[in-house]
């Protein structure tokens, strides 16, 4: 009976170990990402990411060095890969777009993808509606 109990506990532990290691998203997404948002290629620079919390605050710039360069602010959840940020006008902090997506599990090339919603047509906000995006770093 003792051997059967130990064998059962070992099997449950082994199965649980695989589940616990199933996550694997990057702990940090700070850096320069090559992105395409609705056929517009450019860069997303994530400059900062907070160090604590299930979801962590991020800041940066989208399309830096271009006429449509804007600051971004949002969050990244390294335990689920979820990502969301808003693209803002620097002059008045108004939101132009809301980007929502997921980061792939950690790999040689990290990838992200999702949709963005354009909520303003001001200064690079584009046409109102929802569009796709993808990125790699």
Regions found by a protein language model. Give the residues of each.
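Central antiparallel beta-sheet cores of small beta-barrel/beta-sandwich binding domains
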Residues: 23-107, 113-137
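General helical structural elements
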Residues: 6-7, 91
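Positively charged n-region of N-terminal signal peptides that target proteins for export
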Residues: 1-4
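Bacterial N-terminal signal peptides
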Residues: 7-15
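Sec/Tat signal peptide C-region and signal peptidase I cleavage site
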Residues: 16-22
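Low-complexity, intrinsically disordered or weakly predicted helical/coil tracts enriched
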Residues: 15-16, 128
């Amino acid at each position: 009976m003792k051997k059967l109990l130990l064998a059962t506990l070992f099997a449950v532990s082994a199965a649980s170990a695989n589940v616990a290691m199933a996550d694997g998203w990057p702990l940090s997404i700070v850096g320069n990402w090559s992105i395409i948002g609705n056929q517009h290629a450019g860069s997303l620079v994530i400059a900062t990411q907070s160090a604590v919390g299930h979801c962590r605050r991020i800041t940066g710039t989208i399309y830096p060095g271009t006429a449509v360069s804007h600051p971004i602010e949002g969050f990244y959840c390294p335990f689920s890969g979820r990502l969301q940020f808003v693209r803002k006008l620097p002059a008045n902090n108004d939101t132009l777009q809301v980007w929502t997506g997921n980061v792939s599990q950690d790999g040689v090339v990290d990838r992200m993808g999702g949709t963005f919603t354009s909520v303003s047509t001001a200064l690079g906000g584009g046409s109102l509606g929802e569009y796709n995006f993808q990125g790699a770093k």
